[in-house]
Amino acid sequence: GQIRRQRQMCIRDSFSNGDIDGFDFQWGGRLYGVGDYSYQNIKKTQRQKMTIGGEEVVEIDINASYLTILHGISGYPLPKRDDLYAIGGYNRTVVKAWITATIGHHGFHSRWPKNAIQEIKDAGIDKPAELTMGLLQPVILDHFPMLADWPSQKVTWADLMFTESEIIIGTMLELMHSYGIACFSVHDSIIVRKSDQQIAMETLKDQFFRRTGIEPRLKVN
């Protein structure tokens, strides 16, 4: 007969900035799988081999999650393209690396951080040496003007992560309580059975809109 190995799964809710005055569990808040064998730690292609109740799964991603949230809370409409990072003229991985590095920082970088360089290298891209953070900055800000005052904004990466986490947790709870649907989180994406894809996407969009006033672009893997 067929033998299936099962593991008990635990998740923890991890908050940030606990040593800052005014902390009240309002920063961070991502769900993390506990242990080295968490489904969150394996490649997306491996997660596609998961099953829920013996059924194939799909992973539903929020495109440019933090950037989309920032559009919503800043009152800017989303650009009319499926991928926010595809601004034209520049590789989307380089654009994403610039935005990720900036949003994760308190201001604008004067040079590429090591993790951004590694992200670009891992994608197999040879970034031109002359393409500095400073050179790319006006191009990015022209497409995403809400980032122009990022160094002085009160909103930080921890606020964006909390909003994203509330959206994901709200989606999981609604799917469970209203529809009896099992759902696993991977930070800015959710995993559900293939047969639950449509209702899961509708629920995720609704939860996102409730908290940001904007509807996200979703991608299904």
Where would I find each of the regions flagged by the language model?
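Catalytic phosphate/metal-binding cores of nucleic-acid and nucleotide-processing enzymes, i.e., regions
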Residues: 1, 60, 176, 190
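N- or domain-start disorder-to-order transition segments that initiate the globular core
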Residues: 12-34
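Catalytic palm active-site di-aspartate
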Residues: 61, 99, 181-192
